[in-house]
From Swiss-Prot:
Promotes colloidosmotic lysis by binding to the midgut epithelial cells of insects. Residues 717-743 are annotated as: Disordered. CDD domains: delta_endotoxin_C. Residues 720-743 have a biased composition (Polar residues). It comes from Bacillus thuringiensis subsp. higo. It comes from the Bacteria. One of its GO terms (molecular function) is toxin activity. This is Pesticidal crystal protein Cry27Aa. Keywords: Sporulation, Toxin, Virulence. Belongs to the delta endotoxin family. InterPro entries: Galactose-bd-like_sf (IPR008979), Pest_crys (IPR038979), Pest_crys_dom-III (IPR005638), Pest_crys_dom_I (IPR005639), Pest_crys_N_sf (IPR036716), Pest_cryst_cen_dom_sf (IPR036399), Pest_cryst_dom_II (IPR001178). The gene is cry27Aa. The lineage of its organism: Bacteria, Bacillati, Bacillota, Bacilli, Bacillales. Toxic segment of the protein is located in the N-terminus. GO terms for biological process: sporulation resulting in formation of a cellular spore; symbiont-mediated killing of host cell.
Amino acid sequence: MNPYQNKNEYEILDAKRNNCHMSNGYPRHPLANDPQMYLRNAHYKDWLSMCNKNNPVGLIPPESFEWTWLNGTVAALTIVSVIAGILVTAPVSVTAGLITVLGAGAALLAGITPLIWPATTDNTFNKITDATEVLLNKEISEFVRKTANTKIDSLQQLIYYYQNALENWKKNPNDSAARNTVSTRFQIVNAFFVEAMPALSMPGYEVVQLGAYAQAANLHLILLREGIAYADQWNLARDPMHAAGDLHYKEFLDYRNQYINHCSTWYNEGQNEANLKNNGLVYQRTMTLFVLDLIAMFSTYDPRLYTMPIKTEILTRTIYTDGVNRNEPKSIHNPGLFRRLEQMKLHIYEYQGAQFLSGHQNIFRSMNYNHPLIYGPVQGYSSSNINKITTINLGDYDKIYSINTESRNRLVQGSTTFDKINFYGAFNENWLFSVYNQNGPIIKHSNIPGIDAPSTGLNYSNYTHYLSNCIFQSNRNGGSAPDYNTQSYVFGWNHYTIDPTGNYVTDAFEVNKNLPESRYVPQISQVPAVKASDIFNPGRVVNAKVESGPYFTGGDVIVSKAQLDGSGLARTLITFPIIPKRYRASGFRVRMYYAANHTGQVSYGVANINTTGYANFQKTFDGWEYFRARHEHFKYIEFDTTFSLRNSGQLEEHLLHIYYPNTTKISGDQLLIIDKIEFIPVGIPLNQTSEGYNTYDQNTNSYNQNYNNYNQNMDTTYQPNYDNYKQNSSGMYDNPYNQNPKDSYNQNYTDTYDSGYNNSQNVGSNYNQEYNTYNQDTENMYNQSYNNYNSDNNNYNQNSDCMCSPGYNGNYECRCNQRANGNYPK
């Protein structure tokens, strides 16, 4: 029997198969199914030209809409989309077969400034502020508005002033006058940002100015990132006790904490007030787009942690459009593992010769496509008299970007019912649900940002969100049959940067197929924790589940809660279905972004492959409530093994194991918050330089952070001791380098990844990173000692109170010197 054959009682609307499969070993879910793929073959000038247009890379032009709130929404969507595109595809130029990867810092600032200050319309600060005034029904005073505008106008002039000097220096990199000019102008703009930020958060107007504040914070952090990247050439903060850029890197970390905590605090204040005023859903959606999506990107700006382009998957949150045929007064939170909406079943009830939509069922698939479908409950009216079910099949690939509904007011009992629902798909497909009744239709468009679609403004080629959830209600108005019910929907949407077909891990993206081996540019792959497929809690001691994330993570997180009672080994297991594709890398380093209120151990392994890595996590915050964790409490730990993943594109299961000996009863919940897993490729042979990434040599499984003369006598908190770190012991670290016990980090290694991170190219690849002048005179909150490191077993024993586990070679990335100076949470 043909399962797609139409029956009298069943109708199936099926998506056409996508025949655009890549011949790269992806049997079901091609890695090329990527909304940002069109940027990957763009050279820098072409890419910059796209970004400097009012309609960048096919996105929606802000000036094409009349409504104030819509202008602000579209502007915010455009900026986040451009940031995500730049991070994942860092623009490149190719000269004589040599690829130059242009650092994301420089590209970000060049790309978003024309979006912040477009040539033909008002600036984005004002658009977003105007929209927030409408949202909150609160007008900013004339004094506050003028003060803010004065600062914004000055910022615009100073940034252009700096960018002119930057372009001049790039044309004349050996000219000392050009170098001094750009360095001076950078520092002037940086100082003005510090002075201007309070004007965007005036007392009494913190929430209404919050969107503008977030945009300014974003610009400031991008500027600092750029200065850190060029610090060596510009001689920034250079003296015998500092490495170039160290002062600005510390400021970057401090200001990032300050900005994120400020935005989190005041978003929360506004959400609470909006819920009380029955405007919670609109506030949640609007301010997520204006503020939370943007600050979630800040974690990727760290130039010493992200030394190559990033395959970003951050915005896993779901936002909801306004209810159709009903008002949804409160914000909506439904924490759970990420799932793809694969089918919808619409139940039709016939009564007195008329047909009515009476029920709706969502059918999902987890990130493991080998698992069975997940059937949600039937929402609405359920009866044995249902005589037709329309099934909408999205298949493996298609996504719905807009929904148009037609409803009718019925004379009987004043109910409202759906006649037509048109679902528009990303592959230019559409599905029509229809029943026939009388009276004129009430037409509603549901999408992000909320316009008529499909149209030139929003269609299958330029959408930013796709349908992920349908909440259906059939509210009875007094009758006993479903025809007396008012039917309503609330639709949930995910951001297009989150791939609903799987977790793809790749070591590089292809720049130009016509080039030889040098055509690949390495990239870091992110896998959000909520894109796990399973959480297994075998006992009652440890319970891990998905919880609403803090406001800066871009979505929900997995929280493991252990109540240790001394009864013996306790554990939980989280399964990540990974689809790896290696082009050139010898393997991957793996790290985890987390926060915890205790110390403990985790392991990471690959099923059916005898490889397991271990890492100790440290206590990063106090208290027994996970939602009290602030941005500065989240740290990275790296597992102590390089993972040689398959290169076939076939799904494999990765296992994150949290375990406790549980030999002693401990009071209070032991909390571990997991936000994401990241994969860093190692051993990629390339012939390229990396402008803007020139501080580091990203080589094999050693994280080279340029701490040559890092002076920590400036209120920092991390004091590592490298002297007795046993690295090549019992084969645990069988890597092609050795640690010099006299504090000289000599990476004499045949460089398989000569990317110019240390501003030198193809020079024998001997990167001598001296720690001899590392000044450990500090307040020493975190005295990290490797003296007791026992490498005779696989138990990564880190005798430390530090928040960071530094992986293989000491401090691969310590963010413990971040300090909180915000007031979040309340």
